Curated annotation (Swiss-Prot):
This is Putative 3-methyladenine DNA glycosylase. One of its GO terms (molecular function) is alkylbase DNA N-glycosylase activity. InterPro entries: Formyl_transferase-like_C_sf, MPG, MPG_sf. It comes from Francisella tularensis subsp. holarctica (strain LVS). It comes from the Bacteria.
Length: 193
């Protein structure tokens, strides 16, 4: 078991904190695009804001997969959101990756986003999926497999607990006051402070 696999087997709230500082990697157009995870949100099976709360559907079926599987969905008729499945198979929990700090493949991210400012590339769920060219084709990928087109990569430079801000989730209408959003303190790439 690698370190990321161990993180994703933690309770989803703990995993959402521990994913901060690790890397999301996309292999696109013969390039490697890398972003450091700087903001996450946890979604639990008993959480009214979670896609698996009511029942299992074709759209949310990947939320019930093995921890470390990607769950990508289309929202508002125009945006993709990228999640990492956590918990045991059949539970239906995931972590939304809300923001990344661009690390590598920045020129391609700028082309993908039609933006040049670093701060505009991955500072929100829809922005980061566009920057890394993540869409429904990436739903159900094993993010712990080094040969996957999208994967998680461990960062030995871990984030201290005192550098993690815990606050309410944003951009949702149900259970929005739950303190399930986490971000790296003073990081300029988070979507909203």
């Amino acid at each position: 078991m690698n370190n990321l696999e161990a993180i994703l087997r933690l309770k989803t709230i703990d995993a959402a904190k521990k994913l901060l500082g690790h890397f999301l990697v996309s292999k696109y157009n013969n390039k490697i695009l890398i972003g450091k995870i700087v903001e996450t949100e946890a979604y639990l099976y008993n959480d009214p804001a979670c896609h698996s709360y009511s029942n299992r559907t074709k759209r949310n079926s990947m939320m019930y997969a093995q921890a470390g599987t990607s769950y990508v969905y289309f929202t508002y008729g125009m945006h993709y959101c990228f999640n990492v499945v956590t918990a045991d198979v059949g539970i239906g929990e995931a972590i939304l990756i809300r923001a990344l700090e661009p690390i590598a493949g920045i020129e391609q991210m700028q082309l993908n986003r039609s933006k040049t400012k670093l701060i505009d590339l991955c500072s929100g769920p829809a922005k980061l999926t566009q920057a890394l060219n993540i869409n429904l084709k990436d739903n159900g990928i094993n993010l712990l497999d080094k040969d996957s087109s999208i994967l998680l990569r461990y960062n030995n430079d871990l984030i201290n607990e005192i550098d993690i801000v815990q606050t309410q989730r944003i951009g949702i209408s149900k259970a929005k006051d739950m303190p399930y959003r986490f971000y790296i303190k003073d990081n300029i790439f988070v979507s909203k402070k």
